[in-house]
Amino acid sequence: MRFILVSPKNRTAYNFRGDLIKRIISCGYEVIVTGPNRVGVEKIEALGARFVEIPINKNGVNPKEDLKYQKALYELFKKEKPDVVLGYTSKPVIYGSIAAKKAGVPHKVAMITGLGYAFTAQTKKAKAIRAVMSVLYKKALNCADTVIFQNPDDREQ
């Protein structure tokens, strides 16, 4: 059985998802963690997970970069054939859920850790990003089998 954790930052995978990674491994899964670079990979691998580098511009708004990220995730999912994919934070949730659905992953989990700048700021830029993100979230969450809200108040948005 194979589980892929789609992470926007290596540090958050280790610091905030380390116990989850260990628990999933203890349940008999092979765990693969994606991240944007090789910084801190040894900590992730020390947990027993395998690491795959997939660059992501976490705060960028370039659709070409985002589609490139989604394509790289899709290719990874087709190659590794995971049983479960879990993405957390906006871009891993959006592009990971869509790619996992297209790749035929049986179980897709989206973890909304917080709404962030696009949904909390009131600038023109934030409002424009919010409009696009709302459409993308709707599509992505329709691809997910399970959606986890770390902050239940975010569910209303």
Task: Give residue ranges: language-model regions.
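Short His-centered aromatic/hydrophobic patch
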Residues: G87-V93, I112
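Helix N-cap/beta->alpha junction signal
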Residues: K9, N37, T89-K91, N151-D153
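Glycine-rich phosphate-binding loop signature in dinucleotide/nucleotide-binding domains
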Residues: L76-D83
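A short, active-site helix/loop in glycosyltransferases that binds the activated sugar's phosphate group
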Residues: V39-E42, N142-Q157
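N-terminal strand-loop element at the rim of the active site
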Residues: R2-K64, Q157
